[in-house]
């Protein structure tokens, strides 16, 4: 192979690596968002139970409003 062909191959490898890395990064962001939403929902369940209990609601007025 000539130098020009080897340089072209190097550029193609770098471009392909960048595209794959960029795509995977966005996929992980989506998974993290879904996991964070699920965790938030799970944490909200005990708070809702607390807000329906008058002594607990009084103790945690900042959470129950």
Curated annotation (Swiss-Prot):
MF terms (GO), sorted A to Z: acetylcholine receptor inhibitor activity; toxin activity
- Indicate the principal place this protein occupies in or around the cell: secreted
Query: What keywords is this UniProt entry annotated with?
Result: Acetylcholine receptor inhibiting toxin, Amidation, Disulfide bond, Neurotoxin, Postsynaptic neurotoxin, Secreted, Signal, Toxin
Write down the InterPro entries for this protein, in alphabetical order.
Conotoxin_a-typ, Conotoxin_a-typ_CS
Q: Which GO terms describe its cellular component?
A: extracellular region; host cell postsynaptic membrane
- Modification after translation, per record: Possibly amidated at Cys-64.
Q: PROSITE patterns from the entry?
A: ALPHA_CONOTOXIN
Cystine pairings recorded for this chain:
50-56, 51-64
The residues forming the signal peptide are 1-21
Tissues of expression: Expressed by the venom duct.
Location of region: Ser-Xaa-Pro motif, crucial for potent interaction with nAChR: 52-54
Residue positions assigned to the propeptide: 22-48
User: Where does this one sit in the cell?
Assistant: Secreted
**Similarity section:** Belongs to the conotoxin A superfamily.
What is this protein's function? Answer: Alpha-conotoxins act on postsynaptic membranes, they bind to the nicotinic acetylcholine receptors (nAChR) and thus inhibit them. At high doses (10 uM), the synthetic non-amidated toxin (residues 49-65) completely inhibits frog sciatic nerve-gastrocnemius muscle contractility. It also inhibit the cholinergic miniature excitatory postsynaptic currents (mEPSCs) frequency and amplitude of projection neurons in insects (D.melanogaster). In vivo, the toxin (100 ug/kg) shows good analgesic effects in mouse hot plate model and formalin test.
The record's comment about this protein's domains reads:
The cysteine framework is I (CC-C-C). Alpha4/7 pattern.
Query: What protein name applies here?
Result: Alpha-conotoxin-like Lv1.4
Q: Which organism is it from?
A: Conus lividus (Livid cone)
Organism lineage reads as:
Eukaryota, Metazoa, Spiralia, Lophotrochozoa, Mollusca
